[in-house]
Structure formats: C-alpha cells, structure tokens
Design a protein with these regions (language model features):
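Membrane-proximal soluble regions of multi-pass membrane proteins
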Residues: 149-203
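Pore domain of cation channels
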Residues: 180-238
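Cytosolic-side membrane-entry/anchor segment at the start of a transmembrane helix
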Residues: 65-122
C-alpha cells in the first residue's frame, strides 16, 4: 500500500467531527470567560463594567472580531466536511492556530484583569480557571489528534515510518492494526495538563508534538500561578 493511500486513510467525516466539535467549543468557552472576567471581576457589588477607549467599547469589539472570524472559519470547515474537500486539513490547521491564539490571548487577558483589580470574587476565579482548563483541554485534544493520527496511519502501513507519539507498547502489541482513538488522545491531553509533561510510557517524538506539549504545559502553569493562587489567597482573606 503506497504512501498516498496511507495519507488519506483518516477517520470519516463523522469521526472527524468529534475533534472539530471540541475545537469549535473552545472559543465559545473563551468568550464566556471573557464576559465573566471583564464584566464582573472588577466590580465588588456585581455591577457590569466595560473596558472602553474614547467612548468605544473595546471589549465588545474584541469579542465581535474573534467571534466573526471563528464562525466564518467554522462554516467553511463544515462545508469542506460535507463536500469532502481535499483542503480540509488546511482549513483545520488555520482554525486550530486561531483558536490556540485565542486561548493564549484569553489567558493573558485573565492575568491582566486579576492583577489590576483589587477585589475579585473567589468563586468567580475558580469558575474561570475551570472553564479555561476545559478550553485548553479541548484545544490541545485537537492538536494531538491532528498531528499524530496521520503518522500512526503511515506507521500502520510502513513499519519504518516513525509516529509523532509513541503510545504504550502494551496497547500496540494487543492488535497489529491498533490505532489511537478519542479516549487515547483525551487521556494524553488531560495527563499532560495535570503533570506538566507527557504521561508515563507516552513518548513525544516529532518536533511538532514537543512544541505543542511545551505550549500546553506553559499555559497550564500560567493558569495555576495567575488564577488558582489568586483565588486561594482571596479565600484566606475572607
């Protein structure tokens, strides 16, 4: 079987949809976080606040631009899925990069907000940290699948081709045609966040996967320092 067949031996569109749905939910969670942290975090009495410049609502403009860009890309991605367009991976790559940048920017906005306001409700901070963790998990779940799965398919047909991620040999030896599924990538994503590194017996091989894990671990570390620590300090002060 040639390389071309292996390259296109990817999950069907309804199987792709699980990972694409995860990627699509992430910016929606980020928008929810933005609304919570920017509208309520700076107000001890719960009044709505705005970030404005010369009368213009910059928060609303930011949310509108991000939402519009991601919605347009999502519509295009759905169209390519329905018509099985050959550029589907290119569209997913663009959407994945933008969603990741949106996640990182949102974490920076959270950090800026909690460092510049004197009083923040501890419950709100814990909620924001949980939502940010969920958004991060969904985003990097997509990246691990997007980068690794094609290499797993190539390795299935050509044993000399290296995989981007080496999964535990016990799972591979059980079935000569074993391929990782959603649960395998979800486990890898969650454990990488929880331990700030790859889980036991999971080895990142490709440079792309190593870069993804570094970005993921750094983002989680920032969340721990900026959000959780501030929430714990607020609880002690109450």
């Amino acid at each position: 079987m040639n390389n071309r067949l292996a390259l296109h031996h990817l999950p069907k569109w309804h199987q792709n949809a699980a990972y694409i749905t995860a990627l699509g939910i992430s910016p929606l969670i980020n928008l929810l976080i933005t609304g919570l942290i920017w509208k309520r975090a700076g107000s001890p009495h719960g009044e709505w606040t705005r970030w404005s410049f010369n009368g213009y609502d910059l928060e609303g403009l930011f949310v509108f631009l991000v939402s519009s860009a991601l919605v347009l890309l999502s519509i295009n991605l759905v169209r390519t899925l329905l018509y099985k367009h050959q550029r589907i991976r290119g569209t997913m790559l663009v959407l994945g990069v933008l969603v990741t940048l949106d996640l990182i920017l949102n974490v920076l906005l959270i950090g800026y907000r909690i460092c510049t306001v004197p009083t923040i409700d501890a419950t709100l901070l814990l909620l924001v940290s949980a939502l940010a963790y969920l958004s991060l998990t969904l985003t990097f779940l997509f990246w691990y699948w997007f980068i690794d799965y094609p290499t797993q398919v190539r390795h299935l047909h050509h044993q000399d081709h290296l995989c981007a991620i080496v999964f535990p040999r016990e799972a591979v030896l059980m079935d000569a045609r074993w391929l990782p599924n959603l649960l395998d990538y979800l486990y890898l994503t969650v454990m990488t966040s929880n331990t700030l590194g790859p889980p036991e017996n999971h080895t990142p091989v490709s440079r792309s996967i190593k870069l993804v894990q570094m970005v993921q671990s750094t983002t989680v570390l920032v969340l721990l320092v900026l959000v959780v620590s501030r929430a714990v300090n607020t609880l002690h002060q109450q």
